[in-house]
Amino acid sequence: MKVLKIILTITIFFSSVLLAKYDKKVDPTELYQKATAHLDKEEYRKANRVLGKYTKSKPKDPDGWTLYAFTQRKLKNYKKAESFYEKALKIDPDNKIALEYQGELFVETDRIGLAQVNLNKLKELCPTSCDELEQLKKYINKEQIRDVKQRV
């Protein structure tokens, strides 16, 4: 009987510890910081998992969707990446980072014309230039140079 009480006590203790662990509220700020730390180390799979949780907790944050799309793109999940960039841009159509990264996705999937559309939108948003505009220009030019070299 004494052994049974000990086993029961241990079971209850560990059950409450496990429940407390899984019952803990997810802090979106903490998730975002964790994801960006993974991105800084180019740990795209880890960042992707964290950003999945983040976007569930903050579904109206265009930056979360943009980073989630970015990790999908880096993992070569182009359809998911495209869908997530679209979500980010639906929330904030003038999100320069989403426009740049979506343009890079278009380049990577051989849709230079669509990348040019994003470039033109960035030109409207940044009449005197901005980092996103310059980065997308470079990305498109680099791809066009690579195509020319392959043809020669």
Specify the residue positions occupied by each region the protein language model found.
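Canonical positions in the second alpha-helix
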Residues: 53-54, 87-88, 121-122
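Alpha-helical segment of the N-proximal tetratricopeptide repeat
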Residues: 26-57
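Structural marker of alpha-solenoid helical repeat scaffolds
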Residues: 57, 91, 125-128
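Canonical tetratricopeptide repeat
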Residues: 67, 101, 135-139
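Register position in tetratricopeptide repeats
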Residues: 40-41, 74-75, 108-109, 125, ...
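Helix-start (N-cap) detector for alpha-helical repeat units in TPR-like alpha-solenoids
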Residues: 27-28, 62-63, 96-97, 129-130
